[in-house]
Each structure stands twice: as C-alpha cells, then as structure tokens.
C-alpha cells in the first residue's frame, strides 16, 4: 500500500526561487520540489548541509502540487551596498566585506508571490 502525506501551504508572501543570477531573484508561481523537500527535511531534523540525506529524501519522494490560487506577483526593488569583486578575495562575513573600505551600490530586485494557496501531496516511493 502506498504511503502519502498531504498538506496545504498558504502564505501572504513567498518566493519559490529559481536560479539566482546577479541582482535578479525570480520566483516560480508554485512551490518547487526543492522547497518542499527542504520543509520536509527540516521537520525531520535533517540539516541543510547534510547533502546525502537531502538527496536521499528528494529521490524517495514523488510530488504533486495543486495550485488553488497562484496569487499575484510582487517585485521588490532595493539598493544594496557591496564590496567590489576582487579575485582571490573572499570575505567570511558580510560585516568583514562592508568594513573592507570601498563599497559599491547595486540595484537588486526580488520577486515574490502574494496570497498563494497550494495543496501538496507527497508519495513515498517503494524501496
């Protein structure tokens, strides 16, 4: 007999991230498998850095998303101070980067879905 887990996700604002390049952070209009796996993994106590267990969980789950209401797209624009990109210079913290002296300002944009309502169904694949 198959084992299922069903639940509802509703949020006033969420981002279902796509690949982030440069200053643009886009979103899908529905929850991604990686987002759902991350939520399930966190609820099971699997650490984010535990790539092996994260991968095993992702491979063990089949996902169905029913979009009850995709919501509306919201774009957030803001300016961010950053240290200039230099070869071989990596800062361990944001504080260290900002204290480095020279700063540049970039325009950044993020996309979110507002008032999305989704039904999620997970099925555990047979071993």
Residue ranges and their predicted role:
Residues 9-15:
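Short polar catalytic/cofactor-binding loops
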Residues 5, 61-63, 116-120:
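Generic beta-strand structural signal
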Residues 6, 22, 108-109:
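Functionally constrained cores in energy, signaling, and assembly domains
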Residues 67-127:
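Internal, well-folded beta-alpha domain core
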Residues 3, 18-88:
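Glycine/small-residue-rich interface belts in oligomeric ring/scaffold proteins
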Residues 1-8:
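Charged, low-complexity intrinsically disordered regulatory segments in eukaryotic signaling
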């Amino acid at each position: 007999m198959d084992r299922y887990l069903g639940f509802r996700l509703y949020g006033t604002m969420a981002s279902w991230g796509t690949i982030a390049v440069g200053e643009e952070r886009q979103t899908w209009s529905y929850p991604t498998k990686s987002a759902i796996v991350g939520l399930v993994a966190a609820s099971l106590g699997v650490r984010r850095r535990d790539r092996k267990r994260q991968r095993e969980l992702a491979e063990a789950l089949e996902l169905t998303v029913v979009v009850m209401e995709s919501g509306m797209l919201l774009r957030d624009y803001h300016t961010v101070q950053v240290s200039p990109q230099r070869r071989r210079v990596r800062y361990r913290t944001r504080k260290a980067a900002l204290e480095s002296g020279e700063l540049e300002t970039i325009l950044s944009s993020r996309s979110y879905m507002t008032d999305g309502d989704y039904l999620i169904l997970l099925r555990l694949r047979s071993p």
